[in-house]
């Protein structure tokens, strides 16, 4: 009892320390009521640690020591260090033992949150907080604050005021803080150096030393101080005293009370400072804590202080160990096992998503899955989600189950995203299932090509394809809405007797300067439910609705393959493609010409004879060094190409083989020559061919046939007759089905207009004048229907009445005042539109080339590209320029299914197997085809 009474009679005598001030001011420093001395800073510095030494302001705001009012000085040697350290260790062990599970789990979640970048970003206080019924809440004792012993006094001393703001010589007091840059453990070095801020130089003031350093770098100055042995030894002692870290005060925990960590969110608002452990140098501190009564429990005269060591980043092995310990602790609590400490609070159930994530991170913990509260066995989907979370954080699982740094790119890395996009699009546009990626050989290929690349999952693959397809559709809609007139291309391809495919595309004209070009964009590749014209019309209207295309914005609908339907279809502004007309002309000639029919019989007889002689097939294979096949079932134009390519084989004279004559070989060669002439105009090509080139092409073909008719004989004459019948609606204005589009387009091309005859030129001029007059009247009517604001219409009516009254002077005065208003109604120019058309035809129909070069031109340079030429003339006559642009942008062919489905530009055969295998997924197949054909637009979406 005597010892207890001596403890409660009053606080022990406080020990004080002082700091020697080297300036001319002597001030007794206030004392701190504490018996807990910190560890020697010299030992900390020798161990490689860096004690914190913040500025005086931050130091004062966070310090929790109590300043005594005693003024009696005492020596520094009176401070008892060893007793305080022993008691500190005892109490720290006691507190940590009672709250070990709480701190352990809080550290686990804190490490997980740092490691996985916010994956475990949850309310840890809610998880770690025990029930309020388990422990009565007791508010913590208010914490008092005080300044730094000596530092505040020196900073406010008259001696410090004698120095200017840019003079750091007053910092030679080791306890004072640097006014302009904060403090660190090297601050006492300013006792031996002086810094001038104006010169940015630090000078040594030890003896006669002339050392100077640019800048106030304390570490470099401390290295120089090693040359002065006595001063350096003194500097080490000063640094040891100055390197004391901040001490946070924490009230004592009564018996049965919860740890302050669990009460932080219940009783006090959240603070930026972290809670600290407690210590006391009194010999009976342990007993007072356990009994709940002591010196510090009822009053704030003495506070418990401890050293807070900086946290170190946990290693992967430590992280796995802590995860395992946390799961084991939770398992013990759920099974009813006795806690390791007698008064440890019970840990509540961990949320299931946190437990499942912890299980997915390390396979070694999965054996605890059945006993974890709220946990469910991990599925392959959840395991993949956990691995994806690791990959997103730049981590991975090692073979032993440890979480290590990943060598692969993060999921949000730019290169990883680019390669994932290209890989997904390449896989989708090749019409290959994602299951092919499960082949280990593919993983080996990617691992060798780019080890840092991670193959995307199936969900990521689908997301990339769907999002890119959506972006493509939106981009196409914006391009279509920006165009005034659209030329739609429609082609019908018959796959089987009951399966047909329609290909809808659009030809857009764009460019600048002299580089105008027409681009073909695929819009749809869809199935026709029947072979009636209504089925085609329904599909066409659905495409227009999907892309928000108004019928008024359609210039022409170029069609091909309509003969595949049972009934002829009628679409708005429909126009048959010239390429399909020319192809039908050539094919009908091969099927109906009597001369070609006789040649066919002889050629088929020769091919059959080769099939009956195996030795001939074997010899042909030896000559080709490959298997030789006879194309007996192919169309005749394919057979002609085959015969010309292997003429030496079919001229072998062997027993049992029927050969054709030399004259017939000449006919075969002539047919092949004609095929080469027609072929560029019958198939799709990347070089856009427009309708203004049709008439010059027809004239050229006719000239070739008339020139070579002597060598071709009846074959040439039959083809010439068939060609004239086919092109009659284009060339002859007197034909009942005459299409004036070709003549007008050719006349509006200043380079090809000379190929027209005088009759054709006159017809084209008359048609163009009529169209321009119609458009001008339509524009004036639209302008007159608009009511002018602010009474301008009545003002204009007065002007027009003065003009009709015959008063020339009044009319001239009115027009002089309201000239712009009058021209806005009557026309932008006084020059007649018909006169502009006549002037254009006069310029392009000059007699000689020399005259054409030196004559004064008002429309531009005729050597420009046609679209560029009319773009430059739009200010002269907008109606004529718009008409020319519309006609000169109409293509002569359509985009066929063969071209859409071919992977190589040289391939011309239809891949029917690709269509038949995707009959059940037509929408997905169309999406893939659009991405592949419009790959140039897709590439611009990611630039």
Swiss-Prot record:
Residues 12-21, 73-85 have a biased composition (Basic and acidic residues). Its main location: nucleus. InterPro entries: HATC_C_dom, RNaseH-like_sf, ZnF_BED_domain_contain. Disruption phenotype: Defective cessation of distal tip cell migration from the dorsal muscle towards the mid-body during gonadal development. RNAi-mediated knockdown of cacn-1 in mig-39 null animals results in a strong overshoot phenotype in which anterior and posterior distal tip cells. RNAi-mediated knockdown of Rac GTPase, Rac-2, in double mig-39 and either ced-10 or mig-2 (which are also Rac GTPases) null animals, suppresses the overshoot phenotype in mig-39 null animals. Residues 1-99, 242-315, 328-348 are annotated as: Disordered. GO terms for cellular component: cytoplasm; nucleus. This is Zinc finger BED domain-containing protein 39. It comes from Caenorhabditis elegans.
